């Protein structure tokens, strides 16, 4: 069975291919001028040995060397500009793709792996373009040009130089025949070390509290040991042949061979000294041009691996928009026999869920952890697609809505709230960048966060730090609520929106939310049942199934799952330490 082909970097460097070709052209021109300079140098040295100074040739030599220098520098400039341009394009395309793939793809691959693609792999491809483009011309064009000139100058010494370099290339080729697998193993081991380092540092408070660092440090040490073992194994298997190949591609063996062969023919009066001198310069130049081939090979292999991961993300499945396009007639939400299973799981997360949340109503979703509440509401904005059944907004199947149309319908306040590194005002404006300061402040007042924001030294311009680290959990939650208030979308999904509210602010927050909820369809996930007792309907989930639905009074009267949850909540409210 043949192995799947590794994606070529050339597929994704299409936008800068013209710049790459231009860089190669200038690099090749520099090589031609450099070769001509070597021949001219041999001519000048021969003249000096004959007590003849050729000032015109000396001036021409300086001009050729200077022109080759500037052409080589310009080639590197063009290749680096192309690399920066490609880096910008790829990061934009990756961000656009990740914004359109399902949340399931992001969940399955993980933030760390996707961050590596957008940072390390794009940077690796940058190095491939910036550094390898001029090296291509040097490693391939220079030896060919030098060999052609050598054949013209003296075919015998040309064959001697070619034999030495050919032997070195054979040894090097045997060394790198499985380099792709070795590089992949190296990258995997390095990623394990990076992951262990991040885990060890980020988990330091927990580590010091519970195990003194032994467990987390043990993972880090095992990752380092695995990395070291991989490197030692590679070195033992190919280290000797790799060193031999590199030594044979070094200019020294070629120079020694040309010295011995040239000396033999020179003593036999079969080789003019000037020709011998020219061959020495050209032959060692040809060998020196092959030196970057080793670095070039590794750059290409690393570029292919980076390209493979980038292409995988760029080709990630985007949830399709079905035809014909539909338009919601109102903000009602309807689930019709919806079932869903997470990728790789053996059991459904949701099974045959059906309910209707009329436009302008408040629907509460309750149940134990893992019951399916959050999964259900996250299917509404198509974070995943249901395996069967359908979800409708205003009578329109969400699979027939354009992404921008669908997202314009739904505002979300997640339980695991997230703030970007920026000011408080910027975080509230997320999704509504043109909102005025007055509108931002009004949203903050409604979310009960204006007072603590105004008390900060910089007010609404206060930086929140990485992931909102400078704010408390409750403050972050209220800012995300202010963000949803400002967006003013017809469907509002609240996932434990009051989870971090203290007793003093919970009533104020609930009144603010009650005012916000007017004329909106609200789906609210809550564990504090007292906060949703006045909901228009309550959906009770258990193990992925909708087991009960109705208002508070009706569900209490049924004396079923909801009634037991309510009773447990009442008991917890009156519980005290010590009895």
Could you tell me what each predicted segment is?
Residues 212, 236, 286-313:
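Cytosolic ends of transmembrane helices, especially the final helix of ABC transmembrane type-1 domains
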Residues 11-19, 103, 120-129, 133, ...:
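An intracellular "coupling" helix at the cytosolic face of ABC transporter transmembrane type-1 domains
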Residues 408-416, 427, 443-449, 461-559:
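ABC-family ATPase nucleotide-binding domain "signature/switch" substructure
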Residues 32-42, 67, 135-176, 234-277:
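A hydrophobic transmembrane-helix motif
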Residues 34-42, 64-107, 111, 115, ...:
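Juxtamembrane helix-loop junctions of ABC transporter transmembrane domains
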Residues 1-34, 53-57, 75, 79, ...:
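Membrane-integrated ABC transporters
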Residues 17-71, 152-156:
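Transmembrane helix-loop-helix hairpins at lipid-water interfaces of multipass membrane proteins
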Residues 381:
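Helix-to-loop junction immediately C-terminal to a conserved catalytic motif
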């Amino acid at each position: 069975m043949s192995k799947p082909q590794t994606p070529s970097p050339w597929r994704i460097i299409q936008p800068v291919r013209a710049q790459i070709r231009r860089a190669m052209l200038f690099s090749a021109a520099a090589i031609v001028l450099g070769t001509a300079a070597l021949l001219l140098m041999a001519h000048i040295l021969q003249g000096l040995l004959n007590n003849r100074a050729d000032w015109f040739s000396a001036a021409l030599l300086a001009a050729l060397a200077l022109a080759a220098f500037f052409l080589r520098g310009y080639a590197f400039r063009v290749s680096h500009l192309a690399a920066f341009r490609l880096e910008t394009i790829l990061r934009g395309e990756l961000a656009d793709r990740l914004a359109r793939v399902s949340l399931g793809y992001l969940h399955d691959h993980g933030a760390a792996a996707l961050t590596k693609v957008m940072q390390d792999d794009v940077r690796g491809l940058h190095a491939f373009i910036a550094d390898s483009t001029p090296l291509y011309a040097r490693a391939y064009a220079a030896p060919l040009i030098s060999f052609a000139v050598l054949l013209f100058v003296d075919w015998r010494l040309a064959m001697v130089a070619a034999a030495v370099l050919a032997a070195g290339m054979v040894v090097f080729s045997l060394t790198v025949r499985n380099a792709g697998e070795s590089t992949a193993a190296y990258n995997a081991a390095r990623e394990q070390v990076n992951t262990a380092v991040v885990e060890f540092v980020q988990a330091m408070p927990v580590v010091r509290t519970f195990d003194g660092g032994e467990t987390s440090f043990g993972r880090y040490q095992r990752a380092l040991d695995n990395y070291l073992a991989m490197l030692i194994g590679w070195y033992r298997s190919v280290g000797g042949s790799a060193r031999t190949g590199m030594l044979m591609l070094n200019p020294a063996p070629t120079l020694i061979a040309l010295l011995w062969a040239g000396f033999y023919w020179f003593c036999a009066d079969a080789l003019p000294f000037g020709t011998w001198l020219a061959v020495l310069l050209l032959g060692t130049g040809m060998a020196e041009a092959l030196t970057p081939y080793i670095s070039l090979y590794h750059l290409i292999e690393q570029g292919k691996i980076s390209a493979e991961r980038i292409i995988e993300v760029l080709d990630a499945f985007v949830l399709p928009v079905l035809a014909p396009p539909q338009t919601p007639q109102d903000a009602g939400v309807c689930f019709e026999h919806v079932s869903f299973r997470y990728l790789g799981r053996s059991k459904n997360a949701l099974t045959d869920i059906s309910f209707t949340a009329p436009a302008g109503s408040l629907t509460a979703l309750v149940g134990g952890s893992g019951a399916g509440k959050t999964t259900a509401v996250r299917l509404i904005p198509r974070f995943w697609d249901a395996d069967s059944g359908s979800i409708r907004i205003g009578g329109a199947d969400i699979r027939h809505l354009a992404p921008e149309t669908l997202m314009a319908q739904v505002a979300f306040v997640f339980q695991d709230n997230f703030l970007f590194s920026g000011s408080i005002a910027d975080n509230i404006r997320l999704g509504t960048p043109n909102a005025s300061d007055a509108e931002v402040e009004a949203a903050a007042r409604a979310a009960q966060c204006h007072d603590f924001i105004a008390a900060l030294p910089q007010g609404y311009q206060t930086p929140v730090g990485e992931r909102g680290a400078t704010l408390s959990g409750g403050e972050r939650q209220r800012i995300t609520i202010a963000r949803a208030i400002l967006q003013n979308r017809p469907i509002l999904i609240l996932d434990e929106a009051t989870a971090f509210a203290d007793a003093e602010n919970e009533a104020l927050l609930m009144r603010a939310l009650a005012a916000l909820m007017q004329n909106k369809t609200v789906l609210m996930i809550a564990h504090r049942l007292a906060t949703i007792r006045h909901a228009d309907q309550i959906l009770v989930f258990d193990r992925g199934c909708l087991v009960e639905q109705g208002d508070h009074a009706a569900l209490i009267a049924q004396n079923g799952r909801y009634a037991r949850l309510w009773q447990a909540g009442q008991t917890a409210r009156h519980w005290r330490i010590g009895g």
